[in-house]
Amino acid sequence: GSLCGDTCFVLGCNDSSCSCNYPICVKD
């Protein structure tokens, strides 16, 4: 549910603990 300091595209998130909720990465 928290935001990651990352945006996601086809390749996903730089932080492997985050998931893509386009266009942002989220974690918990």
UniProtKB/Swiss-Prot annotation:
Biological process according to GO: defense response
Post-translational modification comment from the UniProt entry: This is a cyclic peptide.
Sites of the Cyclopeptide (Gly-Asp) crosslink: 1-28
Cysteine pairings via disulfide bonds: 4-18, 8-20, 13-25
UniProt xrefs under SUPFAM superfamilies: Cyclotides (SSF57038)
Keywords annotated in UniProt: Disulfide bond, Knottin, Plant defense
InterPro entries with a match to the protein in the record: Cyclotide_sf
Domain-related comment: The presence of a 'disulfide through disulfide knot' structurally defines this protein as a knottin.
Purpose of the protein: Probably participates in a plant defense mechanism.
Similarity-based family: Belongs to the cyclotide family. Moebius subfamily.
Name of the protein described by the UniProt record: Kalata-B12
